Regions:
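Short loop/turn segments immediately following the C-termini of beta-strands
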Residues: 85-86, 139, 191, 233-235, ...
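Short loop/turn segments that connect beta-strands within beta-propeller blades
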Residues: 96-100, 149-152, 200-204, 296-300, ...
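Blade/loop signatures of beta-propeller domains
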Residues: 25-57
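Residue-level detector of Asp-centered blade-edge/turn motifs that repeat once per structural unit
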Residues: 75-76, 129-131, 181-182, 223-225, ...
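Short, conserved, GDST-rich strand-edge loop motifs in beta-rich repeat architectures
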Residues: 28-40, 83-85, 231-288, 438-454
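Surface-exposed loop and turn segments in beta-propeller and other repeat-based domains
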Residues: 48, 60, 105-117, 156-169, ...
Length: 454
């Protein structure tokens, strides 16, 4: 049996919210619920994962290609597209007629993909207002591609290596993106060059780029579309040592760490009698683990107007233990008044006031009081209900969707999903959730010597 067949997209038609039960302060013994049960995939019942956890996803499931880390939903809620990356086939899946009988088209088709159609893809997707085409972030190909939503054919491409003002970035990695409501401007992150791109969709050209923080990962527009927000997940800024790469003299490369973690030498770099080793920067800099606000009232003259640190600082005492890593804000979503950022390493959501661009609260995502000192919820994708009363969080580490009451900033409960929910969207009527599960139902046994791929 081909394990790739079990990577799923879960379409939830019914949302049920259960309140968390409070527990007394007592000793707990925690263990994997599966005990000594073998790994098992059960599409209609309880699946046993290799890590000993159970899967009992709500809603209905539809198969797409492996690792659907990206998701976009059309304005009418009838078309969803997933970006499938990680292992072959690198592809997108176009799901039409979501409200009735979904039809799924993989582009390019087949188990091996097609390098001539889609050589690279990562997360970023946007559907044009007329539902005719989808923009696809082509990752390390340093471009954005467009595909016809009806035929699945590739129609055009945007070269992100050069912009209208003459800037050149020959090496880039295009990720998350968001499209303006009128479809005239596309905003995308270049993870490799630490920048945010502004693209004119009529000219199919990058018109401006803005330097942002370390490793930009998530992006969102404010409701009035006067600002775009970028979430930076990176801690350090790595630099090349001298001219080793240009001269291919790799014998001069270091085979050992140049400095200790979080030392002055690490932050600022060191100089020896033979080489200069650049520093990695301050892990608590506003360039690291942060959300940046960029004014786009004039797309020809974008300006960074705020740098917001989210979650816990490196070294900050949390539950009596100093934090080693940062917050890793990875995804963003905005309402009229608030911007929400999911802090993947802190298991919480930062609430940012859009008027002041400052944090007003962090919402903890602990499924139970007995495990409050542990980390591992891994909040990822975010979505808001049309009435802006509920926030939905893809909790990748516990295979669930967290439901938060926005007026009260309170967790209401958790909805079971497939393995490692990544991105999610709410249909326009507010009745359904569409969520991609990056690991689907997990993997079963190997196919054996007679297995045929496909």
């Amino acid at each position: 049996m081909n394990f790739r067949q079990f990577f799923k997209l879960i379409l939830l038609f019914c949302i049920t919210v259960s309140s968390c039960q409070s527990t007394k302060n007592e000793l707990y013994v925690l263990s994997a619920p599966a005990g000594n049960l073998y790994t098992k995939i059960n599409r209609t019942g309880t699946t046993v994962l290799p890590n000993g956890r159970f899967l009992t996803p709500a809603g209905k499931s539809y198969e797409v290609a492996p690792h659907p880390f990206g998701l976009v939903l059309s304005g009418d809620g009838e078309i969803a597209v997933t970006a499938n990356s990680g292992i072959s086939p690198l592809s997108i899946s176009i799901i039409r007629n979501l409200s009735s009988k979904p039809e799924i088209r993989q582009v390019p088709p087949g188990p091996s993909g097609n390098a001539g159609v889609l050589e690279s893809v990562f997360m970023g997707l946007a559907i044009s207002p007329d539902n005719k085409k989808v923009y696809v972030a082509a990752g390390q190909d340093n471009s954005i591609l467009t595909f016809d939503l009806l035929t699945g054919n590739k129609s055009d491409s945007i070269d992100c290596a050069v912009s209208a003002d003459g800037e050149r970035f020959p090496d880039g990695y295009i990720g998350d993106m968001v499209l303006s409501k009128d479809g005239t401007h596309l905003f995308a992150v270049d993870q490799m060059n630490f920048r945010m791109l502004i693209i004119d969709t009529k000219k199919m050209q990058v018109i401006k780029s803005v330097q942002v923080g370390r490793y930009p990962f998530g992006i969102a527009l404010s409701h009035d579309e006067k600002k775009v927000y970028v979430a930076n997940v990176g801690m350090f800024q790595y630099s090349k040592i001298g001219r080793i790469e240009q001269t291919s003299d790799y014998k001069k490369a270091l085979s050992f760490p140049a400095f200790g973690y979080n030392t002055e030498a690490m932050r600022n770099g060191i100089v020896t009698d033979s080489m200069v080793i650049p520093g990695l920067g301050d892990p608590n800099s506003d360039k690291a683990f942060s959300v940046w606000a960029i004014s786009i009232e004039d797309c020809d003259n974008p300006k960074v107007i705020a740098r917001i640190k989210t979650g816990n600082l490196v070294g900050q005492m949390v539950d009596g233990i100093p934090a080693v890593g940062g917050s890793s804000p990875n995804s963003l979503v905005a309402t009229t008044d608030w911007l929400f950022a999911s802090n993947g390493s802190n298991d919480n959501i930062s609430v940012i006031d859009l008027k002041t661009d400052s944090i007003v609260k962090d919402i903890s995502l602990k499924p139970d009081e007995s495990v409050k000192h542990f980390r591992g919820v891994i909040p990822f994708g975010l979505a808001v209900s049309p009435d802006e009363k509920k926030l939905f969080v893809a909790e990748a580490g516990i295979n669930a969707i967290g439901v938060i009451d926005i007026p009260a900033f309170k967790v209401l409960g958790h909805i079971p999903t497939g393995w490692f929910p990544s991105k999610l969207k709410i249909t326009p009527d507010g009745r359904n959730i569409v969520v991609t599960n990056a690991k689907g139902y997990g993997s079963g046994p190997n196919g054996g010597k007679d297995f045929k791929e496909g």
